[in-house]
């Protein structure tokens, strides 16, 4: 399946289609959007975002704890869309505050 991903960035929102077997960060870059990242392995908080709507599968990541995931945080480098999803990007400072 392919879903519509909307990223709400500091520069404004962007939208693109993302297959359910491709990481949101990877697809965003293919579409020409620059997003923050570091490890690309789900082991840090550089790419953190917050889900405003929809759902993702980020089971490949290991940095976020259950409470952070419950609060809506997402690591875009290991997140597969499970529905149409809206994610607020650039949330590392909020996550680590």
Swiss-Prot record:
Cofactor(s) in the UniProt record: [2Fe-2S] cluster
Q: From its record, what is one biological process in GO terms?
A: electron transport chain
**What GO molecular function annotation could you give as one example from this UniProt entry?**
electron transfer activity
- SUPFAM superfamilies cross-referenced by the UniProt entry: 2Fe-2S ferredoxin-like
Taxonomy, top ranks, is:
Eukaryota, Viridiplantae, Streptophyta, Embryophyta, Tracheophyta
InterPro entries referenced in this protein's UniProt entry, alphabetically: 2Fe-2S_ferredoxin-like_sf, 2Fe-2S_ferredoxin-type, 2Fe2S_fd_BS, Beta-grasp_dom_sf, Fd_pln
Family, per entry: Belongs to the 2Fe2S plant-type ferredoxin family.
Q: What protein does this entry describe?
A: Ferredoxin
Q: How is the cofactor bound?
A: Binds 1 [2Fe-2S] cluster.
Q: Where in the numbering of this chain does the 2Fe-2S ferredoxin-type domain appear? A: 3-93
Query: Function, please?
Result: Ferredoxins are iron-sulfur proteins that transfer electrons in a wide variety of metabolic reactions.
Where found, per UniProt? Plastid, Chloroplast
Q: What domain of life does the native source organism fall in? A: Eukaryota
Kindly give the PANTHER family that the UniProt entry links to this protein: FERREDOXIN, FERREDOXIN-2, CHLOROPLASTIC
Question: PROSITE patterns given for it?
Answer: 2FE2S_FER_1 (PS00197), 2FE2S_FER_2 (PS51085)
One GO cellular component from the entry?
A: chloroplast stroma
UniProt xrefs under Pfam families: Fer2
**Residues that bind [2Fe-2S] cluster, according to the entry?**
39, 44, 47, 77
Q: Which UniProt keywords apply?
A: 2Fe-2S, Chloroplast, Electron transport, Iron, Iron-sulfur, Metal-binding, Plastid, Transport
What is the protein's major site of localization? Answer: plastid
């Amino acid at each position: 399946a392919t879903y519509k991903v909307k990223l709400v960035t500091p520069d404004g929102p962007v939208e693109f289609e993302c297959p359910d077997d491709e990481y949101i960060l990877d697809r965003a870059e293919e579409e020409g959007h620059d997003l923050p990242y570091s490890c690309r392995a789900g082991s840090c908080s550089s790419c953190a975002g917050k889900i405003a709507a929809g759902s993702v599968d980020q089971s490949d990541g290991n940095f976020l704890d259950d409470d952070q995931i419950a609060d809506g945080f997402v690591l875009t480098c290991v997140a597969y869309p499970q529905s149409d999803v809206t994610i607020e990007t650039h949330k590392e400072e909020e996550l680590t505050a």
